[in-house]
């Protein structure tokens, strides 16, 4: 019973890797998409407002932090709140 479960998991893992490789080959390299992704991340962390606290800056409430950052309650620092976009 244990052996059949392990074999099933191994087959599923191989199928996942195979499907991922086929999709990557079909779609092409991610290197073309990387610069756009990096520029969008730069816009998130280099916002025009400089009145706010940057990443890992001290804070007391969420409004102290820049966009897409939130004040962590335990150590009182600005960290990413998990959002993207404007």
Curated annotation (Swiss-Prot):
Keywords: Amidation, Disulfide bond, Ion channel impairing toxin, Knottin, Neurotoxin, Potassium channel impairing toxin, Secreted, Signal, Toxin, Voltage-gated potassium channel impairing toxin, Voltage-gated sodium channel impairing toxin. GO terms for molecular function: ion channel inhibitor activity; potassium channel regulator activity; sodium channel regulator activity; toxin activity. Residues 55-56 are annotated as: Involved in active face. Transmembrane segments: none annotated. The modification Phenylalanine amide is found at residue 84. Residues 22-50 form a propeptide. GO terms for cellular component: extracellular region. The record marks 80 as: Involved in active face. Expressed by the venom gland. Residues 1-21 form the signal peptide. It comes from the Eukaryota. It is found in: Secreted. Negative results: does not show effect on Kv1.1/KCNA1, Kv1.2/KCNA2, Kv1.3/KCNA3, Kv1.4/KCNA4, Kv3.1/KCNC1 (all expressed in oocytes), voltage-gated sodium channels (Nav1/SCN) (from DRG neurons), and in a range of voltage-gated calcium channels (expressed in rat DRG neurons). Does not show significant toxic symptoms when injected into mice and into cockroaches. This toxin acts as a voltage-dependent gating-modifier. It inhibits the sodium conductance (IC(50)=124 nM) and slows the fast inactivation (EC(50)=1180 nM) of Nav1.5/SCN5A. It significantly shifts the activation to more depolarized voltages and decreases the deactivation of Nav1.5 currents upon extreme depolarization, but only slightly affects voltage-dependence of steady-state inactivation. In addition, this toxin causes an approximately five-fold decrease in the rate of recovery from inactivation and an approximately 1.9-fold reduction in the closed-state inactivation rate. The presence of a 'disulfide through disulfide knot' structurally defines this protein as a knottin. Belongs to the neurotoxin 10 (Hwtx-1) family. 28 (Jztx-11) subfamily. This is Kappa-theraphotoxin-Cg1a 1. It comes from Chilobrachys guangxiensis. The lineage of its organism: Eukaryota, Metazoa, Ecdysozoa, Arthropoda, Chelicerata.
């Amino acid at each position: 019973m244990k052996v059949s479960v392990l074999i099933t998991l191994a087959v599923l893992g191989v199928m996942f890797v195979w499907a991922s490789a086929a999709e990557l080959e079909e779609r092409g390299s991610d290197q073309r998409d990387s610069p756009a992704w990096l520029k969008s991340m730069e816009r998130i962390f280099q916002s025009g407002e400089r009145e706010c606290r940057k990443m890992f800056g001290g804070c007391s409430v969420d409004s102290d932090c820049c966009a897409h950052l939130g004040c962590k309650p335990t150590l009182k620092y600005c960290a990413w709140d998990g959002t993207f976009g404007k």
